[in-house]
Amino acid sequence: MAWTYFVVGSGSIGRRHSANLQSLGKIVEHLAWREFDAEAFSNSLARCSGQAAVIIATATDVRSELVDICAVHNAPMYIEKPLAFTQKDVAAIYGIEIGLQQRSMVGFMMRYHPLTMFLSKFDSCEFFRLQFEIGHDVRLWRENWSFSESYAARAEGGGVLLDLCHEIDLACMICP
């Protein structure tokens, strides 16, 4: 039986994951969060008999239900960054079976860029001072997108700090 990849979230990132998997010839079920049916999703995972993986590309504050369902079915997850919105959600994720944790990951993909890997090899004790600057214009992040109407603008969405956590992750990698 071939693997089925479930992509949950129909924003720009969810659409990109779905398109990338389809271009690789994978079986993809793309589910919009707004029409999400937890019972139907759980049944679909069960039908895959352990041959399913889930890409979670929803707003941060609605992921815990998805993670719980994936854990019940032992389905590995790729969770778009940031991982969670509350400490309770982080604790729940870290509470899932260790084998499933080891087969899942958070989408901090910039840490695998060759420059990041090169810089992270330096001994941070030798740094006198480092300065990080982020030059994003949030109005230009995504096509046909308005920051004021986005999940990142809502307190429940985590705000810009969580949306720009790639940069915080990079700083922590380069200067542990």
Q: Locations of the language-model features?
A:
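N-terminal Rossmann-like dinucleotide-binding module
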Residues: 1-39, 45-47
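Beta-loop-alpha module in the N-terminal Rossmann-like domain of NAD(P)-dependent dehydrogenases
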Residues: 17, 37-94
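Recognition helices and adjacent regulatory flanks at domain boundaries
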Residues: 31-38, 62-67, 110-112, 116
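Histidine-centered beta-alpha loop that forms part of the nucleotide-sugar donor binding/catalytic region
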Residues: 59, 82, 107-109, 133-135
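Rossmann-fold dehydrogenase core element
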Residues: 92-109, 125-132
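Predominantly a Rossmann-like dinucleotide-binding segment in NAD(P)-dependent oxidoreductases
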Residues: 110-176
